[in-house]
């Protein structure tokens, strides 16, 4: 997967490209990341990339010229059909389905990281194909949001995770949250690991995990259950969980 990043702070991305699942994907060649700094596409001695907004107001606005030149260079290197994405609190809310769509669209992506009060609206109209948000809150810039998107995409690419099946237990896979997990010791301050997880019966363990994944979803994100059609087994397991939960 080819991925371009337009950012004023390229070194920030060392935090993910050198470590964890993203670093593994980069080292294996599944994810190829290139970065362009808009300051490298300025022609004045101060490398100016921002200016005051017309009409007044607080903050500064990223200028269109350096950003557009950086995007043009990215398209020249990655391909003119690369999809340009602006990470913005005004964008569509990112979810797991869209992560899969972006990761498997066989198209290079260019992530534009805004700073200051935002970017010139004309750049959005001229160059941005999609706007995406990671939540209803504001960050100091688009770099952290881009890292979230990159990490989410990297873990669904082939060869990134050591165990491909681990994706299937992730929260939001098939619109369900994940089940609880436990590790040693078996007992900690009187709290015991559920006996079924110690039984060695994988059929019972899988059934328990499905039951508690559904239960977790019902308690924490009931809105997700409205998006899926439960099987008869899932309905029975969820009913069983509800009865146990409500009875204390």
Curated annotation (Swiss-Prot):
Keyword Transmembrane helix: no
Reaction(s) catalysed by this chain's protein: guanosine(37) in tRNA + S-adenosyl-L-methionine = N(1)-methylguanosine(37) in tRNA + S-adenosyl-L-homocysteine + H(+)
Binding positions (S-adenosyl-L-methionine): 114, 134-139
GO molecular function: tRNA (guanine(37)-N1)-methyltransferase activity
Pfam families tied to this protein: tRNA_m1G_MT
EC category name: transferase
EC number: 2.1.1.228
GO CC terms, sorted: cytosol
Subcellular location: Cytoplasm
Matches recorded under Gene3D superfamilies: 3.40.1280.10, tRNA(m1g37)methyltransferase, domain 2
Similarity comment: family membership: Belongs to the RNA methyltransferase TrmD family.
NCBIfam families: PRK00026.1, trmD
Subunit organization: Homodimer.
The protein's name in its UniProt record: tRNA (guanine-N(1)-)-methyltransferase
Species the sequence originates in: Blochmanniella floridana
């Amino acid at each position: 997967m080819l991925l371009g990043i337009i950012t004023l702070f390229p070194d920030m991305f060392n935090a993910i490209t050198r470590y964890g699942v993203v670093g593994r994907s980069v080292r294996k060649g599944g994810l190829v990341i290139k970065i362009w700094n808009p300051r490298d596409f300025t022609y004045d001695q101060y490398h100016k990339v921002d200016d005051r907004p017309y009409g007044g107001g607080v903050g500064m606005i990223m200028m269109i010229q350096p950003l557009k030149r950086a995007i043009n260079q990215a398209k020249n290197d990655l391909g003119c059909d690369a999809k340009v994405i602006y990470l913005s609190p005004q964008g569509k809310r990112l979810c797991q389905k869209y992560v899969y769509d972006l990761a498997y669209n066989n198209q290079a992506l260019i992530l534009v990281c805004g700073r200051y009060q935002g970017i010139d609206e004309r750049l959005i109209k001229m160059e941005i194909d999609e706007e995406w948000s990671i939540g209803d809150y504001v960050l100091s810039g688009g770099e952290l949001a881009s890292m979230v998107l990159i990490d989410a995409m990297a873990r669904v690419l082939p060869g990134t995770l050591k165990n491909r099946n681990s994706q299937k237990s992730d929260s939001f896979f098939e619109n369900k949250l994940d089940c609880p997990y436990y590790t040693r010791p078996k007992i900690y301050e009187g709290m015991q690991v559920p006996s079924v997880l110690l039984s060695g019966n994988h059929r019972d363990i899988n059934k328990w995990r499905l039951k508690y994944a559904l239960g977790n979803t019902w308690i924490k994100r009931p809105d997700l259950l409205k998006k899926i059609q439960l099987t008869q087994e899932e309905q029975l397991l969820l009913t069983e969980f509800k009865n146990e939960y409500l009875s204390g």
